Amino acid sequence: MASQYAAELCMLLVEDNFGELFGRIFSTLHRYERLTLPRLLGLTRLSENRLRAALVAMIQHHLVHFYTAVEEGGVTYYSANMQAAYYLIRSGKILEFVEDRLGKYAATVMSTIMYLGHAQVSHLDTLPELRSDASKTNGVNEGEHDRPEGENETNGTNGEHVSDQPALLHPTLKALAGHGYIVRVREAHFQSIADNILNIERQIRSGDSVQSMKGKKLEEFVVEKTADMLKERLDGDLTRGLIVNGVPRGVKRSQTNGVSDDNETEKARFDYDDGEDEDEENEWLDDEVPMESSLTVRVNYEKLDVALRNRRFLELAERGAPPESAQIYDYLLRRIEYQTSKCRDASEIPREGEEGEQYSVPIPLSALARDIDPYLDLAGSLGPTNTPANNRLGKRTFDDTVDDNDDDHGATGNRTYEIDQHLSLLAQPPLNLTSKRLNGGIINWTVEFRHLARKLRHLELERIVEARYGDVALRVLRVLQAKGKLDEKRLQEISLLPFKDLRQVLASMQTGGFVDLQEVPRDAQRQPSRTIYLWYYDPDRARDSMLQDTYKAMSRCLQRLKFERGRLKDFLEKTERSDVKGNEELYLSEGELDRLREWRAKEALLIGEVARLDDMIAVMRDY
């Protein structure tokens, strides 16, 4: 990620969110990589007290890694954390997702943790913005409808029973931890992966267990042991004890009848039962035990990437399958999400053709059948399975009419079969969204992550090619992707395009970096007349080129936003005054109101464009 445009983007994000001082230190650390404090003082030309205070704050927000080298006399090195800086751009998307999944108060808690970088539970207990919501809200039930303003009343008459209900902070923290959206902060989180690996390898090689090993056997042992110890050091999982039968504790199954008038946000929110635990307990009983007050938590961006990736997979299903099949797929992805910690094990971007298959955890069909809304119509979207018998007059017999008792008996037996049929539909080409597995005679369904991530990348590249060069270029791209390297004559025969149009399209795509030309001489003379020219499409090269172009476009959007804010600095300071904010029509003239509306529209356009470009980055790099 440490390219010129990526570094420029991260520096702009840090400066926009934390100010010029943080941006100056971050850009210096990225430019010179690992630096000691005296060296950083000389390069930034800041006072020591100011630099130390800034470094402490940046370490708290995980923008800076530090490592103390004991073998060098306790010298501390500092380095920039590019990934944490980039995730600043995804914070709004994450908060929107958490609010959709767990409610508005959970999004407020997550926003507070993001704002602090990491926080102790005891400190979160003291924050007024989290306590005030607890006294105004009636509970924290997943999937709860947001009430209109003025209807969020306290639990009791005139607030006399507010203390009877536990505060919402600890149940919400448990819900966030159960879903994996927050993790425990470990000491290794403040160090870079390279420093952690170096420290672990040094520790292993100095141990007694490797003294008798040599050569290849020693290297294999060190690599294997390093991977295990690194995973253990970075493990901040808090889901232990909060997951029951594969789903977070306290999550209840949705009881909608499938004919409700809820908005799309509520329809997309599926809740799960605790499984086979049928005790009708008060849901607050589990939440009466507070989280450990000394526990320090932070946002788990890797887990949230998994959730956002599953949302993209669901969009593929919604575009190509019936709504009922897409809803079943959502249940399957939700189950898989709870047991998937990160999108992929390797940090580097996998090359095309070199990444192997990576299947999700298998989800039993019986577990899905318990999760899915019993009122969801599954048979209607599949169509009739058999043709009803008619009598000689062409009419249905009396026995073919609907019998409620028979339907009740058949519904239980056929529902699992119907769910299996919907998932089988999603497994068929061209969707290929699911995979069926048999384990000891039990039907399990999985998702092949690498195949779907590759499909998302190809669809994104095809969309860009079609938008830039037209549908003819898209046809040529698909031919080259399917057939490999082709000469111009063979490419023309397959694509059924005139030579003139084909050459124009190929020249344009070559300039854009999507296709390239390989020269294969027939003899040692290498004469042009004795050379074969093969056109080919390299998806890895196209992806890398698109990544750099996208980083550059995002940087330009942020720079333009910064310029526009500077141009309207005095006016925006006036609109952000505490007495003016919310009462603009009282304090601003008509011209100023028009100017404010114009600015907000321009700001929304630029920020929306950055968010759209971030979706492309996620597909090309993170998924």
Curated annotation (Swiss-Prot):
Superkingdom, natural source: Eukaryota
GO CC annotation: RNA polymerase III complex
Sequence segments annotated as region (Leucine-zipper): 550-571
Extent of Acidic residues compositional bias: 273-282
Keywords, comma-separated and alphabetical: DNA-directed RNA polymerase, Nucleus, Transcription, Zinc
MF GO annotations: single-stranded DNA binding
Listed InterPro entries: POLR3C_WHD, RNA_pol_III_RPC82-rel_HTH, RNA_pol_III_Rpc82_C, RPC3, WH-like_DNA-bd_sf
Intracellular or extracellular location(s): Nucleus
Subunit text: Component of the RNA polymerase III (Pol III) complex consisting of 17 subunits.
Biological function: DNA-dependent RNA polymerase catalyzes the transcription of DNA into RNA using the four ribonucleoside triphosphates as substrates. Specific core component of RNA polymerase III which synthesizes small RNAs, such as 5S rRNA and tRNAs.
Name of the protein described by the UniProt record: DNA-directed RNA polymerase III subunit rpc3
Organism: Emericella nidulans (strain FGSC A4 / ATCC 38163 / CBS 112.46 / NRRL 194 / M139) (Aspergillus nidulans)
